[in-house]
């Protein structure tokens, strides 16, 4: 058996199928499990997806939000069991795959138009 086939068999079992379609510019709610001492709880992180990277089991996405006037970015593995669920709040209309320019913007300048969805 080829090494590539073995690798695909191992990773295909770990891929998640409950992930909604989203891309850079979309606002998402990420419910992440965090461990505090002996307790495990779910922490909500809501913000704009500024990038998606990789494919397969290595795929990641970065979410940016403003918390108490400070920009906070968190990168999550797409297929991580530590992420309980992902909800898409709104679909953003952007023309870039990586939205690093949002780091320099603040207030109304950092707003993203909503993408029209055909029903």
UniProtKB/Swiss-Prot annotation:
Instruction: Alphabetically list the UniProt keywords.
Output: Ribonucleoprotein, Ribosomal protein
Keyword DNA repair attributed: no
Cite the InterPro entries for this sequence. Ribosomal_bL19 (IPR001857), Ribosomal_bL19_CS (IPR018257), Ribosomal_bL19_sf (IPR038657), Translation_prot_SH3-like_sf (IPR008991)
Annotated transmembrane regions: none
The answer on whether this UniProt entry bears the keyword Ribosomal protein reads yes
- Which Pfam families does this entry report, sorted A to Z? Ribosomal_L19
A GO molecular function term, named singly, is: structural constituent of ribosome
GO annotation, biological process: translation
Superkingdom of origin organism: Bacteria
Q: Name one GO cellular component term.
A: cytosolic large ribosomal subunit
Q: What family is reported?
A: Belongs to the bacterial ribosomal protein bL19 family.
* Job of this protein: This protein is located at the 30S-50S ribosomal subunit interface and may play a role in the structure and function of the aminoacyl-tRNA binding site.
> Protein name, please?
Large ribosomal subunit protein bL19
Gene name, per UniProt, is rplS
């Amino acid at each position: 058996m080829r090494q590539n086939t073995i690798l695909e068999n191992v990773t295909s079992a770990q891929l998640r199928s409950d992930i909604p379609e989203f891309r850079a510019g979309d606002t998402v709610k990420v419910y992440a499990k965090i461990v505090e001492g002996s307790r495990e709880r779910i922490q909500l992180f809501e913000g704009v997806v500024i990038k998606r990277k990789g494919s397969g089991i290595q795929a990641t996405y970065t979410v940016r939000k403003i918390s108490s006037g400070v920009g906070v970015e968190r990168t999550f593995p797409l297929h991580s069991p530590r992420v309980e669920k992902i909800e898409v709040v709104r679909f953003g209309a952007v023309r870039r795959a990586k939205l690093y320019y949002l780091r320099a913007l603040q207030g109304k300048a950092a707003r993203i138009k909503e993408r029209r969805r055909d029903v």
